[in-house]
């Protein structure tokens, strides 16, 4: 089940829908207002990185910011889904990282430009294997954590999400159709910060899933 779900996610999923500022403490640490409705943006599926892979920092950057998140894997086509039945459209869960080139994002924001280049590059969405839906009894009661070289950087509870899982599915499906294998990243708790070349990230959902990734410089082939 988990193997087939992750295969569908990688091969059939059409998009990664991300929810920004969905934890009040994280919005505050970045100097952003707490949103009154979900802040959503997209990442390409080409940014996926399987557990054990290497996160690549592109030249000339020296670091990326880590953001650990609960990922929802959509199990069936969803359009205009009522909040009351939204959980029926989840196929599974995963732990994911929304790696962010914060310098590029800040520069784009200051110029009033989109910031896909800051979040959509190859290896910028490391993700675990898919947890079957039955393994996660209450997605509103999970602990997310992230360590860099063994030092805890992030630890937060999904109950602190501003917009809960059923609402997110209903809201997003009212804007765009979600397909089997699509992924929703539900936001990150406070504690985001830089990770540099040569460091190692471990992250997980306590008691359910754990991932690890090395961080290295991206090396392009010689032209």
From Swiss-Prot:
Catalytic activity from the UniProt record: oxaloacetate = enol-oxaloacetate
UniProt-listed Enzyme Commission number(s): 5.3.2.2
Coiled-coil ranges per UniProt: none
Transit peptide (first-last residue): 1-30
Record flagged with keyword Translocase: no
Transmembrane parts of this sequence: none
Entry keyword set: Isomerase, Magnesium, Metal-binding, Mitochondrion, Transit peptide
GO-annotated cellular components: cytosol; mitochondrion
Note on how the cofactor is bound: Requires a divalent metal cation for activity. Binds copper in vitro.
Chief place of localization: mitochondrion
Keyword Mitochondrion: yes
Enzyme type, top EC level: isomerase
Binding of Mg(2+), residues: 67, 69, 98
Highest rank taxon of the organism: Eukaryota
Cofactor(s) annotated in UniProt: Mg(2+); Mn(2+)
Cellular location(s): Mitochondrion
GO molecular-function terms, A-Z: acetylpyruvate hydrolase activity; acylpyruvate hydrolase activity; copper ion binding; oxaloacetate tautomerase activity
GO term, biological process aspect, one: oxaloacetate metabolic process
Function: Tautomerase that converts enol-oxaloacetate, a strong inhibitor of succinate dehydrogenase, to the physiological keto form of oxaloacetate.
Record family assignment: Belongs to the FAH family.
Protein name, per record: Oxaloacetate tautomerase FAHD1, mitochondrial
Organism from which the protein derives: Arabidopsis thaliana (Mouse-ear cress)
Gene name for this UniProt entry: FAHD1
């Amino acid at each position: 089940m988990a193997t087939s779900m992750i295969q569908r996610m990688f091969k059939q999923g059409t998009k990664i829908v991300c929810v920004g500022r969905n934890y009040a403490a994280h919005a505050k640490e970045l100097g952003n207002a707490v949103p009154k409705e979900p802040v959503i943006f997209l990442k390409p599926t080409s940014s996926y990185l399987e557990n054990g892979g290497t996160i690549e920092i592109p030249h000339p950057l020296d670091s990326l910011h880590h953001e650990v998140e609960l990922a929802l894997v959509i199990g069936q086509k969803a359009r205009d889904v009522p909040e009351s039945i939204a959980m029926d459209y989840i196929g599974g869960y995963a732990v994911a990282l929304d790696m962010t080139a914060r310098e590029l994002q800040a520069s784009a924001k200051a110029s009033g430009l989109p910031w896909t280049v800051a979040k959509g590059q190859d290896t910028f969405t490391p993700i675990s294997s898919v947890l079957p839906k039955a393994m996660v009894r209450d997605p509103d009661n999970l602990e997310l954590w992230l360590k860099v070289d063994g030092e805890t950087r992030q630890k937060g509870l999904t109950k602190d999400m501003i917009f809960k899982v059923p609402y997110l599915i209903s809201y997003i499906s009212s804007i765009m159709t979600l397909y089997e294998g699509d992924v929703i990243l539900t936001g990150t708790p406070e504690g985001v910060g830089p990770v540099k070349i040569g460091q190692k990230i471990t992250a997980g959902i306590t008691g359910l899933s754990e991932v690890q990734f090395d961080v290295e410089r991206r090396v392009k082939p010689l032209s």
